[in-house]
Amino acid sequence: MKSWFRTEDGWAVWLGLILVLLALPSAFGVDLLGWAAKPEVWTSPGQSIAPLSKAYAGYGRAVHVLATTGFVLALVGLGAAWMRFDLVEFMPRFAALFVISCVCYTLGHNAYIAATPDKRAGLGLDWSLGLTGE
């Protein structure tokens, strides 16, 4: 049987478990990941990113984006290092892929794409595709 620490699938499970364990305390009022960035349905680019928790809203959007990117790079880098990947080669490529995917995900939250019919009026829209951001 292969070790769960030597395969990408195994590390996907471990990293997912780490994220679940970090998110679980929020059910009891302890928010460990509220600083992370999340896309919002937006009509202007300045509204596109917000922290997971409103308690962290005082920090700039760039802080949330950089912290989230750094956190994900650290987690994935841990797995890549354990599997003996060449980090000099792996990390910039993963970072580029992560940033591109985040940009696409955020663009998909544009109100004309993502706003559902019940949210259009609140966003000042007459129409939208109603596809949601997911």
Regions found by a protein language model. Name each.
Residues 2-134:
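Helical membrane-embedded segments and adjacent short helical loop/helix-boundary regions
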